Amino acid sequence: MDFRVIGDTYRYGVRVSAIVMREDKLLTYKVEDQNHLVGGAILVGEASRKAVAREVKEELGVDCEVEELMFVVENRFDYKGELHHMIEFHYKVTLLGEVPSHTLDEGKYECEWIDLQRLSEYDIRPQYLTRELPLWKAGIKQIDIGFEKYYEKNIRGRLKR
């Protein structure tokens, strides 16, 4: 069971992403005009480090070495009128096999390497990585993507208690 709660007007969850870099490029997969990181929801009771290894295996079909935790993010955003509040763990990951041309999940999305210096030219999801990833040197960076003014104005009254 995924570690998430879904209501009528909101979605809350805990997820992981694999930040795979080679030769100053970031591995993503393309969904329409957006580029996403490999990752997904943590299962209830699952450690985040194990979750990212599982997601890499499920989506790419290769084993990996989960290295260091790079970012811990509290990310709140509105997507199609639904409030999303996600706690996210982004790990630096080294793949122990070849990258397939497409993901293995139902979508079979095309894998794409993006030059770190050109991230701003792409619609990377999550969007804050376009800004944060080129600045990262070492250690864990905590990021709070809040929109308190937007939340107070547009969403607070919609949440059912």
Task: Please provide the spans of the model-predicted regions.
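Nudix hydrolase/Nudix homology domain
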Residues: 31-35, 106-161
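Thr-Gly-centered strand-to-loop micro-motif
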Residues: 37-39
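Acidic, metal-coordinating catalytic segment for phosphate/diphosphate chemistry
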Residues: 1-17
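Unchanged
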Residues: 42-65, 76-127, 161
